[in-house]
């Protein structure tokens, strides 16, 4: 792409050399910080590569322009670099300050993107050093020549001529331009409201986890027998490469690793197995996609609604009614109610007086029953340095019936045997496996399992159902753990965006020595969102923590073109040009470097935007936001910046005329008073 615009191998090599040099310096700084190569740091390097050449392109373009009036290469390199030094420093700093809040964030966002922020900061500093020190040096050593009459130059000349004509017409219709831009912005906001939201996009890592929860007291043999069904399902699935099973207590997990070239995605296999699990009423089965990345924590096809209340009976009824309504929603495979997961307990109540007659205590009776039902570990055998626990159990089926248990003979202290039924009775009761409370209130969770294709539609339908359901006075909906985490992280990101906006404004105010020009450039940031939201909508992507990170990064990139444009226009006005002529000339001269810097960044983002690789989808939203935002901002910068410039300049002239008129009237008043005296 560089060679396409320059048409000179040496010029392309000079600019291209800034990438490996900047990358090398970045890796050194990353190593000093103790960063590792992972999906986040590699993704940040991909993002940074496209921006590493921006400053170098601006510098060499300026050197080429200076060489036309200054034959001496060294002089052209010095003057060309000096001309854009302030602009590229300001542009680099605006990019850096955007990532500073990112690098200092806490919580899940900080864990995920702290290294991303620091890595891009290191890359921008390294690219600035390369652009200001190495590009002018290489320019004088390699002596590149700007080729003319290139195919791209012919297109650019035609486009520049057309742009100049259009820009002059649009500058005379400033209200229309602003009105159309605002209308597009409003339409984009409405479009953004149709996009689904999630915390982190789920990566397809090719791992499916089946978690089976059994009722407490279920023997290992029965658990193993139940799991054989899932083992058979895994064996019959052609996309499963291998699987493993682990059993611990009353739960078991089957983890299936899928082949690389599979016919179904991980989400489709999860949906398929969830439909099978929905028909299993004798066990609680949860099927999810799994993996090693942080996204696996979020990649679930279930959605949880929590209810709170101080009346447990009303809470249970409200949860049961809500569960029944949720089951009617399209896309919901099954629902679970945490209060429904109760266990029927058979309590053996020992009469202490009757037990005392036989020299027994309730504790002794309880220990005997425990040993009979669960077995006991009387001794441990050591053989060749290894210890083996000896476990004694009654034969299977000896006491699996309450009548048999009540016939259990207990040895008394008098040397006789008494049946358990003579000193105890059986009472039945329902007992919750788990009783949840939060802030002193009972809490129940209604969990819905949905198909991956309709997960967001089902979630929206469930939320609408909860919003329109009239609950008893003692029952109120509460945020689930995942919803609370999502709200906290999104709020932290929005705060980071606000801090970054303020820092960018301060940097530009110092650069232009005027808050007016800074505000003018900042106004282009919201309009860049037009392209971002439009591309997210076209690709049916979600708004997530990762895509919001893209919005944050977009701020630092978008203003760079605006800084170059305004800085160039101010310099031309200082040389005596009129405002309109300076804006047209600035747009014409900055057109090629703006297009080059934008295209290099966009092209570097395309592989990430396509979501290539198993984990590519995780960073895809960020790339789509930047690609769409940069495309829109480049077009709007060339049109809106001149329009805003004229509007602000007109107001500034009116304010100056009003100030002069006021000062003149004050002087006239003082002169009249002096004459009267």
Predicted features by range, described:
Residues 4-65, 506-589, 595-614, 639:
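Hydrophobic transmembrane alpha-helices and their membrane-interface caps
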Residues 84, 151-200, 667-677:
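Signature of alpha-helical transmembrane segments and their immediate interfacial
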Residues 198-261, 275, 312-345:
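Extracytoplasmic/periplasmic
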Residues 49-63, 84-104, 111-150, 254, ...:
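Transmembrane alpha-helices and their membrane-interface boundaries in multi-pass membrane transporters
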Residues 32, 36, 103-111, 181-218, ...:
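Transmembrane helices with small-residue packing motifs
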Residues 316-450:
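Beta-strand-rich non-transmembrane domains
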Residues 222-301, 356-373:
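Solvent-exposed, membrane-proximal periplasmic/extracellular interface segments of envelope transport
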Residues 16, 60, 65-93, 113, ...:
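Helix-loop junctions and hydrophobic alpha-helical segments within the transmembrane domains
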């Amino acid at each position: 792409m560089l060679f396409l615009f320059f048409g000179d191998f040496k010029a392309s090599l000079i600019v291209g050399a800034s990438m490996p040099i900047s990358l090398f310096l970045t890796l050194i700084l990353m190593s000093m910080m103790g960063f590792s190569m992972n999906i986040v740091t590699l993704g940040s390097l991909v993002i940074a590569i496209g921006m590493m050449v921006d400053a170098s392109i601006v510098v060499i373009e300026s050197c080429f322009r200076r060489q036309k009036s200054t034959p001496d290469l060294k002089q052209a390199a010095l003057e060309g670099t000096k001309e854009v030094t302030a602009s590229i420093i300001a542009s680099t700093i605006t990019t850096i300050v955007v990532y500073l809040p990112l690098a200092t964030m806490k919580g899940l966002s900080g864990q995920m993107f702290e290294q991303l922020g620091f890595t891009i900061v290191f890359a921008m500093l390294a690219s600035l050093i390369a652009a200001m020190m190495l590009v002018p040096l290489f320019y004088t050593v390699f002596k590149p020549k700007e080729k003319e009459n290139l195919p791209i130059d012919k297109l650019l000349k035609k486009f520049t001529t057309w742009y100049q004509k259009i820009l002059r017409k649009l500058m005379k219709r400033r209200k229309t331009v602003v009105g159309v831009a605002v209308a597009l912005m409003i339409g984009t906001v409405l479009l953004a409201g149709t996009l689904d939201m999630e915390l982190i996009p789920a990566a397809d890592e090719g791992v499916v986890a089946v978690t089976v929860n059994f009722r407490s007291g279920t023997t290992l043999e029965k658990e193993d027998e139940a799991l054989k069904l899932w083992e058979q399902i895994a064996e019959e699935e052609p996309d499963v490469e291998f699987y493993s099973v682990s059993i611990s207590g009353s739960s078991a997990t089957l983890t299936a690793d899928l082949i690389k070239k599979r016919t179904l995605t991980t989400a489709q296999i999860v949906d398929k197995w969830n439909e099978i699990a929905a028909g299993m009423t004798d066990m609680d089965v949860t099927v999810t996609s799994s993996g090693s990345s942080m996204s696996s924590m979020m990649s679930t096809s279930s959605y949880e609604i929590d209810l709170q209340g101080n009346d447990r009976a009303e809470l249970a009824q409200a949860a049961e009614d809500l569960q029944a309504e949720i089951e009617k929603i399209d896309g919901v495979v099954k629902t679970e109610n945490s209060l429904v997961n109760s266990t029927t307990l058979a309590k053996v109540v020992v009469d202490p007086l009757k037990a005392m007659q036989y020299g027994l205590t309730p504790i002794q009776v309880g220990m005997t029953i425990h040993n009979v039902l669960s077995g006991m570990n009387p001794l441990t055998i050591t053989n060749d340095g290894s210890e083996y626990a000896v476990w004694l159990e009654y034969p299977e089926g000896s006491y699996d019936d309450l009548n048999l248990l009540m016939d259990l003979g207990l040895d008394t202290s008098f040397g006789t045997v008494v049946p358990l039924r003579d000193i105890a009775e059986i009472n039945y009761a329902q007992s919750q496996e788990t009783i949840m409370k939060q802030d002193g209130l009972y809490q129940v969770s209604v969990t819905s399992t949905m198909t991956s294709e309709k997960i967001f539609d089902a979630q929206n339908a469930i939320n609408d159902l909860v919003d329109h359901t009239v609950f008893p006075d003692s029952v109120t909906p509460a945020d689930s753990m995942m919803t609370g985490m999502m709200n906290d992280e999104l709020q932290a990101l929005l705060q980071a965006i606000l801090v970054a906006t303020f820092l960018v404004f301060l940097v530009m105010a110092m650069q232009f020595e005027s808050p007016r020009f800074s505000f003018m450039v900042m106004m282009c940031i919201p309009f860049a969102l037009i392209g971002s939201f439009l591309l997210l909508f076209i690709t049916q992507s979600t708004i997530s923590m990762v895509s919001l990170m893209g919005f944050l990064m977009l701020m630092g990139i978008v203003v760079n073109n605006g800084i170059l444009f305004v800085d160039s226009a101010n310099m031309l006005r200082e040389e005596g040009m009129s405002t309109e002529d300076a804006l047209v000339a600035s747009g014409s001269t900055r057109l090629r470097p703006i297009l080059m810097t934008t295209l290099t960044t966009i092209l570097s983002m395309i592989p990430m935007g396509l979501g290539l690789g198993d984990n590519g989808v995780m960073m895809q939203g960020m790339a789509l936001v930047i690609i769409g935002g940069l495309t829109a901002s480049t077009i709007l910068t060339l049109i809106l910046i001149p329009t805003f410039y004229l509007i602000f300049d007109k107001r500034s002239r009116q304010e100056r005329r009003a100030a002069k008129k006021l000062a003149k009237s004050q002087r006239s008043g003082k002169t009249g008073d002096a004459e009267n005296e």
